C-alpha cells in the first residue's frame, strides 16, 4: 500500500484540509454503513473507510503516513525480530495514560456530539428579484433525527448498551505481520463501528442509524442587491447531527437569471437603446426603461453611436447598504436602410448645404428592382 491509498478511499486530495477530510468521511461512512447498505462488500468498504479516517483524521498519524506510509502511521518501524513494541492493551492506550496525568488526550471520543453535514440548495431569481430582494420558500430532503427513536437508533423502550468488544472505546487493537515485523495498531471496532455502543434492538424506522430522510421546507429572505454565486447561510437547516450534536447548516446559492433588457455588474445596471440619425443630429428627449420605472433622458444634438449616459441612482442597491448604483444607457444610432425619393432628395440637399461632395449611389439593375418590388408587397 502506498501513501496515497487512504486519501483515495475517502475521495480527497493529499492537500485536503481536516474539515474536508471529516466531511468526506461522514459522506462515505453514511453511504457504506452496514445498517444502511446491504450490498455485498459494503461492510468491508466501510471498514476501509474507517481505517483511512483513523489515520488521516489525526494530524500526527497523517504526517507519519504521508512520510512513511501505513507502517509509520501505525506505530513506527520494527527491527525485523518480530518485536511489536510496547503493548498498551492493558493500560487503555497511551492517550488514556496522558489524559490521566495531564487532563487531556489526543483520542477522539466516539460518543462525543458531532454536528450534522451541511447542505447546499441553488435558487433561481428573476433579475428584478435580485435587485430588490425577495422571500423564497425552498423545499428539499435531508437526513433528520428519526421521529420514532428520537435519534437514538434503538427501538422505543430500549437503549444502546456499551459495546461488548471494545468496551466503549470505539477502537480495538489489531496485530499485523509486516515485512518490518509484527505491529500492533488500533482500528475502528467492527461491532459498534466506532460509536462505543451496541444497539441490540434497532429502531424499526431508521434501522439503527438514528436518522431518516425527511422532506423539509424553510423560508429564505433574499436581501436586495444579491448576485450570482453568493451564498446565504441558514444555521441548523442542514442534516441531523450525531450523538445528540446540532444540525448542520443550509447554504442557499444564488443564481440570477438573465434579463431580456438589462445587464448588471454589481450595483451598476446597463441598458442599450437605438435612436435614429435625426434624433442623434438634432437632439431629443426619449423615455428609457429602468428597474425603477421609465425615466426621461435628454439626448443632446450631435450624439454619436456608443455614447453612454448615466442615470444616477437608477441601478441596484449596494449589498452592504451604501446607497444605490447607477444605470448606464448606451445609444446606437441607426442608419435607415430604405429611403424614398423625397428622403433621398432631402439628404442630397443636406449634403450640398454641408459642402459634402455629391453622392452617386450605384444604380440598381433589373433584378434588384424586381426584388425591391416584391419586398414592398
Swiss-Prot record:
Disulfide bonds: none annotated. PROSITE patterns: DNAJ_1, DNAJ_2, ZF_CR. A zinc finger (CR-type) spans 133-215. Zn(2+) 2 binds at residues 163, 166, 189, 192. One of its GO terms (molecular function) is ATP binding. GO terms for cellular component: cytoplasm. Keywords: Chaperone, Cytoplasm, DNA replication, Metal-binding, Repeat, Stress response, Zinc, Zinc-finger. Residues 5-69 form the J domain. Participates actively in the response to hyperosmotic and heat shock by preventing the aggregation of stress-denatured proteins and by disaggregating proteins, also in an autonomous, DnaK-independent fashion. Unfolded proteins bind initially to DnaJ; upon interaction with the DnaJ-bound protein, DnaK hydrolyzes its bound ATP, resulting in the formation of a stable complex. GrpE releases ADP from DnaK; ATP binding to DnaK triggers the release of the substrate protein, thus completing the reaction cycle. The J domain is necessary and sufficient to stimulate DnaK ATPase activity. Zinc center 1 plays an important role in the autonomous, DnaK-independent chaperone activity of DnaJ. Zinc center 2 is essential for interaction with DnaK and for DnaJ activity. PANTHER family: CHAPERONE PROTEIN DNAJ, DNAJ HOMOLOG 1, MITOCHONDRIAL-RELATED. Belongs to the DnaJ family. This is Chaperone protein DnaJ. The lineage of its organism: Bacteria, Bacillati, Bacillota, Bacilli, Lactobacillales.
Amino acid at each position: 500500500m502506498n501513501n496515497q491509498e487512504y486519501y483515495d478511499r475517502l475521495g480527497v486530495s493529499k492537500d485536503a484540509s481536516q474539515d474536508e477530510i471529516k466531511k468526506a468521511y461522514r459522506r462515505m461512512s453514511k453511504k457504506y454503513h452496514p445498517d444502511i447498505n446491504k450490498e455485498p462488500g459494503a461492510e468491508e468498504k466501510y471498514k476501509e473507510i474507517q481505517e483511512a479516517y483513523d489515520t488521516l483524521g489525526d494530524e500526527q498519524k497523517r504526517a507519519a503516513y504521508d512520510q512513511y506510509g501505513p507502517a509509520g502511521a501505525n506505530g513506527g518501524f520494527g527491527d525485523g525480530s518480530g518485536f511489536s513494541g510496547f503493548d498498551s492493551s492493558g493500560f487503555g492506550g497511551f492517550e488514556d495514560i496522558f489524559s490521566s496525568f495531564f487532563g487531556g488526550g489526543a483520542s477522539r471520543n466516539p460518543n462525543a456530539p458531532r454536528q450534522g453535514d451541511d447542505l447546499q440548495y441553488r435558487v433561481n431569481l428573476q433579475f428584478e428579484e435580485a435587485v430588490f430582494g425577495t422571500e423564497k420558500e425552498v423545499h428539499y430532503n435531508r437526513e433528520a433525527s428519526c421521529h420514532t427513536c428520537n435519534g437514538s437508533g434503538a427501538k422505543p423502550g430500549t437503549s444502546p448498551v456499551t459495546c461488548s468488544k471494545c468496551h466503549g472505546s470505539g477502537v480495538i487493537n489489531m496485530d499485523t505481520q509486516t515485512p518490518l515485523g509484527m505491529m500492533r495498531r488500533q482500528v475502528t471496532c467492527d461491532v459498534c463501528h466506532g460509536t462505543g455502543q451496541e444497539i441490540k434492538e434497532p429502531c424499526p424506522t431508521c434501522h439503527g442509524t438514528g436518522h431518516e430522510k425527511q422532506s423539509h421546507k424553510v423560508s429564505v429572505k433574499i436581501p436586495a442587491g444579491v448576485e450570482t454565486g453568493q451564498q446565504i447561510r441558514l444555521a441548523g437547516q442542514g442534516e441531523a447531527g450525531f450523538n445528540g450534536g446540532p444540525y448542520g447548516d443550509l447554504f442557499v446559492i444564488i443564481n440570477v437569471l438573465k434579463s431580456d433588457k438589462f445587464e448588471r455588474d454589481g450595483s451598476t445596471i446597463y441598458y442599450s437603446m437605438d435612436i435614429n440619425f435625426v434624433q442623434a443630429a438634432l437632439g431629443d428627449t426619449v423615455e428609457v426603461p429602468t428597474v425603477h420605472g421609465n425615466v426621461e433622458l435628454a439626448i443632446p444634438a450631435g450624439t454619436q453611436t456608443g455614447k453612454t449616459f448615466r442615470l444616477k441612482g437608477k441601478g441596484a442597491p449596494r449589498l452592504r447598504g451604501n446607497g444605490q448604483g447607477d444605470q448606464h444607457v448606451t445609444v446606437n444610432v441607426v442608419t435607415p436602410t430604405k429611403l424614398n425619393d423625397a428622403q433621398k432628395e432631402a439628404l442630397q440637399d443636406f449634403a450640398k448645404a454641408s459642402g459634402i461632395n455629391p453622392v452617386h449611389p450605384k444604380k440598381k439593375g433589373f433584378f434588384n428592382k424586381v426584388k425591391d418590388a416584391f419586398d414592398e408587397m
